[in-house]
């Protein structure tokens, strides 16, 4: 793979946003907000895992993600590609294949039998590992996976995702404080811009979603929703 043969990063961001919209991975509902794993409600939901069921779009998105990592971090920056259990595993496999590198995966916690391993696959001591996931919000789950990688004797200074929320400045700051650089293909801003160009959602919905993204706590508070 030669990164210079691919579109620039902003074009790849827009194209990835369009692909996510086309496979109906993006959901907005301002009347009945979605409840996320954190327990907080939001009018936005994205399911990047749908990519694995759409081969042509999946292939393009994984080409783009691999290209972005190689542009940002370098062609020879890694020795191993690791996926986080479970959503990150297929994406790590796709990236590892494109970079011709070994792949492993990281469990959320050590298994309670056998060798009680938390890292599956071979990850040599000192290996430079790229952690691949489907998306990131506040980056919290990434840090747990990175800690497991580092505790296994490898190094991990980079994580790559298809989608980053992009409206939480503390995310990259939190990751950077732990020595981790985030590489993401596309964000909510890219998705909304593409949705507006393609008329995927009405303008009232997009405007309300933008209000939420600019002030999530205020948006929830105005509706009497949990803000903690």
From Swiss-Prot:
Source superkingdom: Bacteria
GO biological process, one term: pyrimidine nucleobase biosynthetic process
Keywords: Glycosyltransferase, Magnesium, Pyrimidine biosynthesis, Transferase
Binding site for orotate: 137
Sequence positions that bind 5-phospho-alpha-D-ribose 1-diphosphate: 107-108, 111, 133-141
Cited Pfam families: Pribosyltran (PF00156)
Pathway: Pyrimidine metabolism; UMP biosynthesis via de novo pathway; UMP from orotate: step 1/2
Entry EC no(s): 2.4.2.10
UniProt cofactor(s): Mg(2+)
Reactions performed catalytically: orotidine 5'-phosphate + diphosphate = orotate + 5-phospho-alpha-D-ribose 1-diphosphate
One function term, GO molecular function aspect: orotate phosphoribosyltransferase activity
Record's function text: Catalyzes the transfer of a ribosyl phosphate group from 5-phosphoribose 1-diphosphate to orotate, leading to the formation of orotidine monophosphate (OMP).
Protein name stated in the entry: Orotate phosphoribosyltransferase
Higher taxonomy: Bacteria, Pseudomonadati, Pseudomonadota, Alphaproteobacteria, Rhodobacterales
Gene name in the database record: pyrE
């Amino acid at each position: 793979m030669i990164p210079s043969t691919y579109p620039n990063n902003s074009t790849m961001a827009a194209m990835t946003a369009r692909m996510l919209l086309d496979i109906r991975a993006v959901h907005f509902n301002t009347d009945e907000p979605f409840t996320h794993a954190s327990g907080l409600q939001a009018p936005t939901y994205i399911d990047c895992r749908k990519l694995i069921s759409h081969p042509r779009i999946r292939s393009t998105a994984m080409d783009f993600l691999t290209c972005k990592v190689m542009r940002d971090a370098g062609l020879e920056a890694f020795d191993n590609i690791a996926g986080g259990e479970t959503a990150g595993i297929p994406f790590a496999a796709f990236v590892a294949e494109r970079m011709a590198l070994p792949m492993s995966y990281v469990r959320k916690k050590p298994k309670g039998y056998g060798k009680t391993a938390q890292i599956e696959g071979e990850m040599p001591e000192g290996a430079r590992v790229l952690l691949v996931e489907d998306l990131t919000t506040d980056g919290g789950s990434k840090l747990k996976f990175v800690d497991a990688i580092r505790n296994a004797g490898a190094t991990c200074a980079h994580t790559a995702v298809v989608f980053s929320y992009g409206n939480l400045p503390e995310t990259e700051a939190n990751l950077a404080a732990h020595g981790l650089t985030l590489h993401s293909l596309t964000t909510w801003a890219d998705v909304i811009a593409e949705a507006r160009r393609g008329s995927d959602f009405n303008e009232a919905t997009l405007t309300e979603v933008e209000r939420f993204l600019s002030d999530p706590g205020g948006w929830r508070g105005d509706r009497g929703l949990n803000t903690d």
